[in-house]
Amino acid sequence: MIKKIFLFFFSLLLISSCVKKRDLSTNTVVAHILSQPDGLHPYNNNSVMRSYIFSYTQKTLLGLDLESLDYYPRLITELPTSSEDNKTFFFELRDDVKWDDGEQVTGKDVVFSAKIMLCHLTNNSQIRPIYNSVIKSVKLDPNNPLKFSMTAQDINWTAKTILGGIYIQQKSYWDPNGLFDNISFEQILDRSFEETDELSDWFNDFNHADNGYKPENLKGLGPYYVSEWEPSQYVTLTRKENWWG
């Protein structure tokens, strides 16, 4: 089992102590980072340290090569193709991507993730405009659960890749009752859906700080999971034994 421990850089004494006590016979990597993340909520936090840890615990449809600055397919089979008017883009998920419980990732997870990212009831006002200014809708292919398309509101140079930046979340975990199935993207974007008590309760739960701090609530498609978080001291990531990648 491989572990990564991220120590928050508060004092040299603390770091020295931790390193000396570390058992070098185990597959453990210790990394020193300057501060703890503001949280590890899939959508509501937005610090650099969060993004760093998410590079191990979460996955997006597309990845960005930091040397060439070119996008590459991560959860999808190839880069999206586009319609003639460059407003609709077509994706196909890899068939080997699975959640930790063994469930296959499908277009339903992508549609759900996009709806939550765009919804004004999600506490992500710092990044939501990046997405709801471009994305008009995400639609499932009726003949293939791994295929879906995204339509942009207008021709935009970020339209082809914008959906690829959302951390994909498991619909069956977050929305087992299909609460969002009958809420359209149009209703979400113009805020015309009915805010029922059930929906308000769902967002109160989803936005709760526990979903950014408690290890058991931090779900993702990455090769590691958060096994321990000691506030202001360290975060421990443990390698998944049966990761799909």
PLM regions and their residue ranges:
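Sec-dependent N-terminal signal peptides
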Residues: 5-13
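Gly/Pro-rich hinge or "lid" segments in bacterial periplasmic/extracellular proteins
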Residues: 66, 168-245
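Short, solvent-exposed loop/turn elements at domain surfaces
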Residues: 37-44, 69-72, 100, 158-161, ...
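Short, well-ordered beta-strand elements
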Residues: 26-35, 88-91, 113, 148, ...
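Surface-exposed binding/hinge segments that line
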Residues: 129-201
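C-terminal motif of bacterial Sec signal peptides marking the signal peptidase cleavage site
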Residues: 16-17
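N-terminal lobe/hinge region of extracytoplasmic solute-binding protein
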Residues: 32-84, 115, 219
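Aromatic- and charge-enriched surface segment that lines or borders ligand/interaction sites
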Residues: 78-124, 149
